[in-house]
């Protein structure tokens, strides 16, 4: 449940409290004491709740402390986690938590609004704590650079939450199907979308649930509306293009093993009249190490949920459709005349069992589109994720923490910085009305770059 669902826009705000989802006690797996990692959570909003729920299901993970500036959420987290056997302490201020719990914490999970990621992650790293930080690294590149520098300086694991990088189905599709066995041949184009209609701004009509205004202002928010809807304000987030697009644009880097050379994007605030773009359509051009030009189209819409979210990779020999929800995309299809029997015999793909959907409706309606022509036979991927989507990425992080080896991470700060550059550039392209061209060095933080604490602690961000 996210903040929007939790806080219905009714006068009886308190009445929604009992509807909060409850984990069964048997799901709160802790594991043997000699293999435990004690962790802290910073931020218990929608994403923080998801990550916390996944953490408690991983053997050997004990949550010892949690921080959120909203007292309602802190107390709710405390009640839930203590019921699952996690004797946690709760805090309003992350610095107080890290100072008091220093000897009790092995690692920290950060799930705060984007503008605070750098401040929280850098502070934790320099306190000697490995960090799992939700994407996007930041809504400002200067802050994302500080995260890279802090990880370099400390040598500690800093995992960025592009969880598809640890999803076994995505790993099989990209590494095994597309890259190692070249089932699709040369992949010339890619398409991805995340269409999700959004509700009006979340509000709270029961004033007793609000964060006191002095507390909000202490932590950089003018009012409760900004706090609840931070993704739509330039100071705090990058809008839907950054919030949603970062997951999928990262896949283009992974598939082609290179960074883009240009992005051209159009969009605007055409429906909701908010600070950040409510729709964006972007074309990325990639130049591979072999000198080949490939293109990818990405769109994010907030006025319609048509087709939901999925990715499609198109090659000379066939195409493959993916989605975190397998009903929306879990199949590859050959071009006419291509025989993929050898790939099914090798176990790379399963036998044909269903047509490939051009697009699939929202998750509660997975009926296929009607067609005039016969659908191509889809060969399903033989790998299915049977865990929550974020859990493998968290497990990968905890493995790196236990082994004290940041090289084990599937998405460290250096890698995530590359996609941050590309995603933030799309907003810039919209704002400036022009194509943004990249140089290879744009995607790397220079080896001789110097740490600037001010850039991680409160620099006023721009819409780029």
Regions inferred by a protein language model and the residue ranges of each:
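Beta-strand-loop-alpha-helix segment that lines the small-molecule cofactor/substrate pocket
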Residues: 113-114, 118-166
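A structured beta-alpha segment of the ubiquitous adenosine-cofactor-binding alpha/beta core
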Residues: 88-106, 110
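N-terminal Rossmann-like dinucleotide-binding module
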Residues: 13-84, 167, 252
């Amino acid at each position: 449940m996210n903040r929007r669902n939790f806080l219905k826009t009714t006068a009886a705000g308190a009445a929604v409290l009992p509807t909060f989802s409850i984990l069964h006690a048997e799901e709160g797996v802790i594991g043997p004491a000699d293999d435990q990692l004690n962790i802290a959570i910073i931020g218990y909003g929608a994403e923080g709740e998801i990550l916390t729920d996944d953490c408690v299901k991983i053997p050997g993970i004990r949550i010892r402390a949690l921080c959120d500036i909203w007292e309602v959420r802190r107390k709710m987290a405390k009640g839930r986690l203590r019921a699952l056997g996690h004797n946690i302490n709760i805090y309003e201020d992350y610095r107080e938590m890290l100072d008091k719990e220093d000897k009790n914490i092995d690692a920290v999970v950060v799930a705060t609004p984007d503008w605070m990621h750098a401040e929280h992650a850098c502070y934790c790293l320099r306190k000697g704590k490995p960090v799992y930080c939700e994407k996007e690294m930041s809504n400002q590149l200067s802050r994302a650079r500080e995260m890279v520098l802090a990880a370099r300086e400390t040598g500690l694991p800093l995992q960025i939450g592009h969880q598809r990088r640890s999803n076994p189905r995505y790993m099989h599709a990209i590494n095994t199907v597309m890259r190692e066995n070249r089932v699709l041949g040369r992949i010339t184009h890619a398409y991805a979308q995340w269409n999700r209609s959004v509700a009006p701004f979340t509000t709270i009509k029961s004033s007793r649930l609000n964060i006191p205004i002095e507390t909000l202002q202490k932590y950089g928010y003018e009012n409760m509306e900004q706090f609840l809807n931070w993704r739509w304000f330039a100071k705090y987030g990058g809008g839907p293009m950054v919030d949603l697009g970062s997951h999928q644009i990262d896949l283009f880097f992974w598939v082609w093993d290179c960074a883009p050379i240009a992005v051209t994007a159009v969009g605007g605030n055409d429906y909701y009249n908010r600070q950040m773009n409510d729709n964006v359509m972007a074309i990325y051009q990639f130049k591979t190490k072999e000198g080949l030009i490939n293109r990818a189209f990405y769109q994010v819409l907030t006025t319609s949920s048509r087709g939901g979210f999925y990715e499609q990779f198109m090659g000379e020999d066939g195409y493959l459709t993916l989605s975190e929800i397998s009903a929306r995309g879990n199949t590859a299809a050959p071009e006419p005349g291509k025989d993929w029997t050898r790939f099914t015999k090798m176990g790379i793909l399963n036998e044909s069992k269903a047509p490939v959907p051009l697009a699939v409706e929202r998750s509660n309606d997975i009926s296929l589109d009607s067609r005039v022509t016969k659908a191509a036979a889809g060969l399903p991927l033989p790998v299915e994720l049977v865990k929550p989507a974020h859990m493998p990425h968290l497990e990968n992080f905890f493995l790196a923490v236990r082994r004290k080896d940041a090289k084990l991470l599937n998405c460290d700060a250096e890698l995530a910085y590359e996609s941050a550059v590309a995603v933030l550039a799309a907003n810039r392209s919209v704002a400036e009305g022009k194509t943004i061209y990249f140089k290879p060095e744009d995607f790397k933080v220079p080896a001789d770059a110097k740490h600037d604490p001010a850039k991680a602690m409160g620099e006023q961000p721009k819409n780029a």
